[in-house]
Amino acid sequence: MSRDRRRWLVPLAFLAFVSLGLPDGVLGVAWPSLRRTFDRPIDQLGLILLSMMAGYLASSFGGGAVQERLGLGRLLVASCLLVATSAAAWSATPFFLPIVVFAFVSGLGAGAIDASINAFAATRFTPRVITWLHACWGLGAMAGPLVMTALITAGAGWRWGYALLAASLVAMAAFFRLTLDQWELPNGARRPARPRGVAGGLREALRSPRVRANTLLFFLYAGAESTAGQWAFSLLTESRGMTAATAGLAASAYWGSIFAGRLAFGLLAHHVAPAALLRLGLAGAPLAALVVCLTRGGPGGFAGLFALGLLLAPIFPLLIAETPNQVGERHAPHAIGFQISAATLGAGLLPAAAGFLARRAGLESLGPFLLAATLLLLLLHERGARR
C-alpha cells in the first residue's frame, strides 16, 4: 500500500465508525416524543430494539459473503444507505408499524458492515488505533443525541432529527463511494489467514465453560450499555423532571464518556496493564449505577450516567483483546463470534426487559436494573478469573 493511501485510510476508518455510532444514541432521546406522536406505551421501545436486533443478526450471518461479492467499500456505502432509508422512512411515516419494520432495515444495514469493518481494522491497524476506532463509534453515538435534543427543544420535533440523520448518512455514503479504492485489500488479503491446527471446532468451543461464561459477559455488558443509553433521557425527563435540553445533554454525555474513556484507554494502553483497567471498569460500574439509583436530583443523575459510561468504556475492547488468553488460541475464533452475537442479543433484549419493567414498576426501576446487571457482570468475570 502506498504511503499516500495509508495516510487517508485511517481517517476514513474513523469516519466509518462514526457513521456506525451516529444512529445508536438518537432513539433514546427521540422515544418520549415519538411515543406521544403515536400514542404508544413506554415499553414498546422494546419492539423497535428487538426488530433492530433481528435485522442485525440476519445480516451479520451473511456479511462475510456479501463483502466477498461487493468489497468492503461498496458494502459500507450500502450499509449507510440502508440506515439512511430507515431514518427517512421514520421521519415521514404517519403510522407506528413502519417504525418497527424499518428498524429491521436499520439493523440489516448495521449488521452487514459491523463485523466486516472490524475484521478489516484487525488486519490493518495497531491495537491503539483499533481502540480509537471504537472511540469514534462513541463520538457518533454522542453527536446523534445532541442534534436530536437541539431540534426537539427548538420545536422542530423528532421527525426533523431523523430527516437530518438520513441526509448525513447519505452524504457519508457518497463520500465512501468516492473513496472506494481506499478500502480494497490487496489480492489474497480479503480475509485474515487462519493458522492451520489452531481453531477448534464449533461444538468443542461450545463445550468450553470459559467460552460460555465469556459469551454471557458480552450479553450483560452490551445490555447494560444499551439500557443506560436508551432509557436515560426518559428517566431524567419523565421521572425526575429534568428539562429536555438538560436531559439531552446528559444522554449525550453518557455516550460521550464512552468516547472519552476509549480515547484515554488508547493513550494508556502501553502504560497500564489491560487486566487492571478491566477490573477498574468492572468494579466501578456498579458504583456508578448505585449513584444513578440513589440520586434523584439532576446533577447526581448526570454525574452517575457520565461515570457509568466512562467506566464501561474500556470493557468491550479489553474483553475482546483478552479473549485468546482467556479461552485459548484454539477456541478464540469461535468465541469471538459467539461474543459479538451475544452482545447483539443483550443490546436488544435487556433494554426491552427494562422497558417492560418500567411500564409496571416505574422508570425509577432503571437504576436497580443497571445495578443488578453491572454487579452480575463483575461477579461473573471474577468467578472466571479465579479458575
Regions found by a protein language model. Name each.
Residues 57-97:
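Conserved MFS/SLC helix-loop-helix module at the cytosolic interface between two early adjacent transmembrane helices
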Residues 59-72, 261-274, 358:
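Helix-to-loop junctions at the C-terminal end of transmembrane segments
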Residues 27-28, 208-252, 256-260:
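Extracytoplasmic gate region of multi-pass secondary transporters
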Residues 39, 71, 92-97, 241, ...:
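Helix-breaking motifs and short loop linkers at transmembrane-helix boundaries and internal kinks
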Residues 102-136:
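Cytoplasmic helix-loop-helix junction between adjacent transmembrane helices
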Residues 272-319:
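C-terminal transmembrane helical hairpin of 12-TM major facilitator-type secondary transporters
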Residues 133-185:
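Helix-loop-helix hairpin linking two adjacent transmembrane segments in secondary transporters
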Residues 329-363, 370:
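A late C-terminal transmembrane helix in Major Facilitator Superfamily
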